[in-house]
Amino acid sequence: MTARTAGGRTGRWGRTPGKIPRVTAHASRASRASREPREPRESRARRTCLAVPGSSPRFLAKAQGLAVDEVFLDLEDAVAPAQKADARAAVAAALRSGDWGAKVRAVRINDVTTGWAYRDVVDVIEQAGEFVDAIVLPKVASPEHVTWLDLLLGQVEQAMGYPAGRIGIEAQIEDAAGLAAVDEIAAASPRLEALVFGPADFMASLGMRSLEIGAQPERYLGGDAFHYPHLRILVAARARGLQAVDGPYAAIHDADGLRRNAASVAALGYDGKWVLHPGQVEIVNAEFSPAQADYDRAELILAAYEYYTTVQGRGAAMLDGAMIDEASRKLALVAAARGRAAGLIRTREFRPEEPLAAGRPD
């Protein structure tokens, strides 16, 4: 990415530790551009989202060479309180000088009830904002949390001369309050790109009897203990055109458990999952990428439907012995988009003269 020349700085904003800064009329006007209606944000690939401790130079360097769709440089749980300031500087330096390729580059800040969140945003965005694609906001319990970040980002963008609204937001839903307000959270800012399920804090919030992050409670006999929050977050995300990303599976050496976990949420419709270790990347990438045959089928449906509706004027047709119609096209669009994002190349072309494509459904 080509670096842009930053505009002059207009000074620092004050803060009250542990509280969300009150939004004044002046602040609202200053960030108005970031809240005006815009076209839907570009959807970024997020099959694998790698957590990278911001206080570890070794991990910051290693992450650059891994085959993940997104890296989020963590200033929250992975960084001890005494290391927060140094981690901000390390993250900004890694963003400026690192070779991240086509990865989505995100930074997870501390939550808005801490005394660190404000400085996380201001320091990192002022030093390396042109290299940040999104901010991950943890422990989002109300839409006001997202609004606060939107306003602050707008102020820093304006002060630094960055395009208004360029930096996106990923909101982590991590407790009962956040899940109860998830519809309002999903609508809180046009910067929002994804809702992320945070299983560890969510399990603690509900009092689940398990110490394994992302794993089913051992004595729970009702099926999938996470199905409701997963589905609730997914519906809220899709209603607002957002992506849905699952949190991590902490047992990094349990490949079978990770595969089952990832396959389940991928089948539900999630776009990706957090990974904590390089050894988890290949499994999660595979589970969130369509199989070649499924991708080919999706592209074939799209091509056949386009032909039959535009050339022959049909509303439905038969393809490989199955009826395809507008509903089929919508499903195929999803699978095809995921296959393209995963870098798949179609191996089968639609030809209307083939017998498999002939005939109107009875």
Give the role of each language-model region:
Residues 17-362:
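Expand to "…catalyze enediolate/carbanion chemistry for C-C bond making/breaking, isomerization
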Residues 6-7, 28:
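Generic early N-terminus positional signal peaking at residue ~5-7
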